[in-house]
């Protein structure tokens, strides 16, 4: 658990940052967040002298674990050459070519700096290409921190979205129509009325910011069909799933193709990145080729390009996926065994190197199902594991991630600690 050094730092941080942190989920660790001294492999080392097995992995980017030597070497090589140019250079071409090998071959790429920027640009691009104003998103799915997507469902009778944050005008939120994840009928209902005005349907192929909620069989394929029938573009937000479920992400894994793909997290190798990828006929609408504006001082940052390229090259060797997926499967199986042994109502959702446990009766196929979970019991599990030296997300609405650094011995140690933690839940 966080110690006195972390407490002292947090008290100082409270005077400097709203809530003491720079992203809200970091404040969810109670009674205050631990502060990191360093990290390597599957471990975080705190300023309080603790060593934690890390299953948060910076909320998804670190599929190779912390401080992978080949990524570190690539970053050091780039730093020797300079770290920001404001001019083109070869590495951005090489990373783009690598991405296009797996997403929209023959297409084009625009590098930005965050997943938020990627989805914001993708939505603007879809509107620019189609000349339409509405987008459709799914309640409980997260696509970053911009006005078009910080929108949830209103009352059952409402057609239009409502802001989920102060500071977003209702008029802006009403341009977003909200459907239910894994519910094709809700999409059909919206599209039957507004389909000729919808620029895009945007979806997390696996709802990774509502825990881990996989798509039902055929759900993504039906979205593909509906979008095409109405002349709308299908945006797959693969900021989490891209290069995680497979080299070709969820689109390869579930055999479905988006019109526009957004990437982030893994593709930056642990450095800030967002990517918009699509076929050439769509991407050429972006400036300077077209009239849909996008620009950024830090777009295609040299250090990020180096880290991202090195990460993908390691992933292409295949072993990292096998190790990460085996770890995810072993942990999911152990959690299922534990809840059965203790007679606890829970659902364990698992897709390769992503998993989450929901303390709820029945299965979890939607964010609405996830919201019914016993959040206090989940937080208790998080706290007990933290005491034992295992760090899982403090919110069940995030994923538990595994990586290539979570080898069988690390997983075995984790399983022992899971068993101890469950004894303390009773």
Curated annotation (Swiss-Prot):
It comes from the Archaea. The modification N6-(pyridoxal phosphate)lysine is found at residue 265. Keywords: Cytoplasm, Isomerase, Porphyrin biosynthesis, Pyridoxal phosphate. It comes from Hyperthermus butylicus (strain DSM 5456 / JCM 9403 / PLM1-5). One of its GO terms (molecular function) is glutamate-1-semialdehyde 2,1-aminomutase activity. Belongs to the class-III pyridoxal-phosphate-dependent aminotransferase family. HemL subfamily. Disulfide bonds: none annotated. Signal peptide: none annotated. Pathway: Porphyrin-containing compound metabolism; protoporphyrin-IX biosynthesis; 5-aminolevulinate from L-glutamyl-tRNA(Glu): step 2/2. GO terms for cellular component: cytoplasm. GO terms for biological process: protoporphyrinogen IX biosynthetic process. Coiled coil: none annotated. It is an enzyme of class 5 (isomerase). This is Glutamate-1-semialdehyde 2,1-aminomutase. It is found in: Cytoplasm. The keyword NADP does not apply. Its cofactor is pyridoxal 5'-phosphate. PROSITE patterns: AA_TRANSFER_CLASS_3. Its main location: cytoplasm. Its EC number is 5.4.3.8. It catalyses: (S)-4-amino-5-oxopentanoate = 5-aminolevulinate.
């Amino acid at each position: 658990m966080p110690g006195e050094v972390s407490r002292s730092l947090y008290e100082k941080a409270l005077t400097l940052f709203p809530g003491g942190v720079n992203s809200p989920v970091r404040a969810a660790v109670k009674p205050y967040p631990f502060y990191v001294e360093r990290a390597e492999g599957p471990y975080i080392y705190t300023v309080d002298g603790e060593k934690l097995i890390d299953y948060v992995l910076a909320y998804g980017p670190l599929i190779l674990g912390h401080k992978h030597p080949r990524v570190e070497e690539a970053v050091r090589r780039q730093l020797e050459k300079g770290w920001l140019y404001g001019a083109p250079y070869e590495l951005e071409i090489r990373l783009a070519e690598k991405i296009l090998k797996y997403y929209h071959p023959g297409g084009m790429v625009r590098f930005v700096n965050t997943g938020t920027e990627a989805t914001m640009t993708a939505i603007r691009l879809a509107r620019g290409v189609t000349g339409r104003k509405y987008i459709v998103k799914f309640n409980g799915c997260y696509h970053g921190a911009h006005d078009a997507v910080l929108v949830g469902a209103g009352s059952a009778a409402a057609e239009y979205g409502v802001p989920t944050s102060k500071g977003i005008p209702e008029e802006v939120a009403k341009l977003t129509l909200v459907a239910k994840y894994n519910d094709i009928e809700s999409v059909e209902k919206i599209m039957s009325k507004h389909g000729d005005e919808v620029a895009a349907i945007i979806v997390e192929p696996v709802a990774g910011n509502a825990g881990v909620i996989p798509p039902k069989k055929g759900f993504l394929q039906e979205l593909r069909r509906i979008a095409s029938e109405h002349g709308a573009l299908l945006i797959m937000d693969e900021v989490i799933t891209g290069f995680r479920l497979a080299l070709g992400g969820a689109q390869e894994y579930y055999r479905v193709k988006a019109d526009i793909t957004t990437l982030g997290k893994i593709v930056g190798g642990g450095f800030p990145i967002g990517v918009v990828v699509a076929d050439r006929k769509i991407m050429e609408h972006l400036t300077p080729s077209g009239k849909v504006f996008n620009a950024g001082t830090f777009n295609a940052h040299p250090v990020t390009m180096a880290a991202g390229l090195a990460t993908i090259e390691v992933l292409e060797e295949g072993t990292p996926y096998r190790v990460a997926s085996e770890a995810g499967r072993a942990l999911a199986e152990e959690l299922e065994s534990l809840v059965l042994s203790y007679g606890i109502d829970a659902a364990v959702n698992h897709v390769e190197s992503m998993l989450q446990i929901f303390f709820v009766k029945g299965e979890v196929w939607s964010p609405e199902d996830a919201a019914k979970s016993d959040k206090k019991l989940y937080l208790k599990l998080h706290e007990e594991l933290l005491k034992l030296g295992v760090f899982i997300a403090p919110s069940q609405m995030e994923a538990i991630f595994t990586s290539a650094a979570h080898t069988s011995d690390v997983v075995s140690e984790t399983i022992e600690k899971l068993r101890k933690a469950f004894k303390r839940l009773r």
